[in-house]
Amino acid sequence: MKVAGVFLLLSLALLCFFSGEFSQGGQDKRGWITRSEGRFPGKGVLRHRLFQINCGEFRDPKVFCTRESDPLCGSDGQTYGNKCAFCKALEKSSGKINLKHRGKC
C-alpha cells in the first residue's frame, strides 16, 4: 500500500512539472512563455528550458560577438550565428523577435 501511495505522489508531481504548473514567468493566451530573457513558444517547463536563452551577459553595448558557430533560428526567419548575435538582434528589435528553434532556419 505504501509503494502505491509513493508511486501515485510521484506521478502527480511529474504531471504537474511537465504540465507547466511550476513554470516561472507568465503565459499569454497564445501559449507564449514570457520571461526577462524573451518570449518562447509552447507550454510547460520542459519546452521552456529547450528554448531558454539568457541574454544578460550580452546587454552591455561594449560586448562584441565572437564568430563561434552555434546557429539559432529567430521568429523573423533569420538564422543567427550564435547566442550573442541573437541577443543583440533581440535587443535591437525591442523584444519583437523570439527564438523559434536551435539550428539553422
Curated annotation (Swiss-Prot):
Places the protein is found: Secreted
Site features described as Reactive bond, chain residue numbers: R67, E68
InterPro entries in alphabetical order: Kazal-type_SerProtInhib, Kazal_dom, Kazal_dom_sf, Prot_inh_Kazal-m
Presence of keyword Metal-binding: no
An example Gene Ontology CC term for this record: extracellular region
SMART domains hit by this protein: KAZAL (SM00280)
Protein name, entry field: Serine protease inhibitor Kazal-type 6
